[in-house]
Amino acid sequence: MAVLALTAAACAAPDAGGGDEGVVLTLWTRAATEAVSKAYADAYNATHRDRVEVTAYPNEEYPAKLASAAGAKALPDLFAADVVFAPQYASQGLWADVTDRFAALDVKDRVAPSHVRAGTWEGRNFALPHTVDLSVLLYNKDLYRKAGLDPERPPRTLREYAEHARKVDALGGDVHGTYFGGNCGGCVEFTMWPSVWADGGDVLDAEGQEATVDSPEMADVFALYRSLYEEGVAAPASKDEAGPTWLGALQSGNVGIAPGPSVWLDAIEAKGVDVGVAPISGLDGGESTFVGGDAMGIGATTGHEDAAWEFLAWTTSDEAQVGVVAKGKGVPTRTDLAENEHAEADPRLVTANSLVAKGRTPYARNFNASFNDPQSPWLRTVRGALFGDAALALADGDEAITKSLRQG
């Protein structure tokens, strides 16, 4: 696939423009992003000559589907992917180079910087943010009141988060102070890495070739979560949580405060839980977030590159980011739109949106195998750091993750 970009021009037909009827653009996405992708497409189709048709695939099947299409030189006109895959797909030439087009956008300096970085390879731009999901603290205001905590005053440090969790846990019964995905590499990186960043630490070098998990900052963050589990403040199910029941635990109304995805706000509220939102902090302050979500680029084999770019550029506009994303209670991909007419009606959304400019998206070509795969060296590191020999796990993890990052 690394040579795909070199052959794409020969394989793709000229952009015919589709005459008066316009062209029909194919857009692929994973199921997790389907609703937002279709909302973009519906709004675009209502006001443009060209049309965008969205096809979604099951999350677990999507990477293989893209690999197969790339091998057959039959990629869709546009496709989105989990942003942590962006460096890999950019390096393999699956997306067309949009460097010059992106540089000409008036809003280029206001597009989520960590997403732009993720879609960059060897100084060239290949993808833009399509959706943004942020890690935040989600807390149960009713349990805060019962525990004697101020529901309008969330924790401002990670140590304070632990104190609040302990106070809620003291309510007893079915109530637990906190919850986390202790058997899920992606869950842990999404929720705990921001505390490392807020404390001035890092997890990877800038090029994604060397792990730096064996650091004082990482050790301290793991130690805090480990203590909450050992004290029984974190729900017992945290140890084996691999992701599928994570949301359900927070929807139960029996968890005081926990880090999680900002997109869960509505889903938790739908169960009758009064939810507060706060930034994830370092042990003694600061704040950061894992800027997740999906990146989107133009399929390298498209015959409609101009039309595809017109849609991709439109998704960065006020019309799309306020009229589609913010209206649907999503996080705008533009840093200057954190406060908008829809978010201002709910201060929690402004809190989340403002983190886009402060957060990070990890950059590594071999990220999935190194961190997200169930067999990844990162998950082994997590298990050891939380429930085993922490010092040994972090030391071994540094070496094993670095080796994995440099493969391929």
Report each predicted region and the residues it spans.
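Extracytoplasmic/periplasmic substrate-binding proteins
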Residues: 191, 222-304
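A structural signal for short loop-to-beta-strand junctions that line the ligand-binding cleft
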Residues: 69, 76-77, 105-143, 286-287, ...
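Long, aromatic- and glycine/proline-rich binding clefts that accommodate carbohydrate-like moieties
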Residues: 275, 326-373, 377, 384
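Conserved N-terminal structural module of periplasmic/extracytoplasmic solute-binding proteins
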Residues: 1-88, 103-106, 151, 262, ...
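Glycine-centered hinge/linker elements that transmit conformational signals in sensory
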Residues: 164-169, 207-238
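Extracytoplasmic/periplasmic solute-binding protein
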Residues: 126-130, 135, 159-211, 255
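Hinge/lid segment of periplasmic solute-binding proteins
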Residues: 83-134, 188-191, 274-278, 342-347
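Conserved C-terminal helix/tail region of periplasmic/extracytoplasmic solute-binding proteins
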Residues: 145-146, 151, 359-408
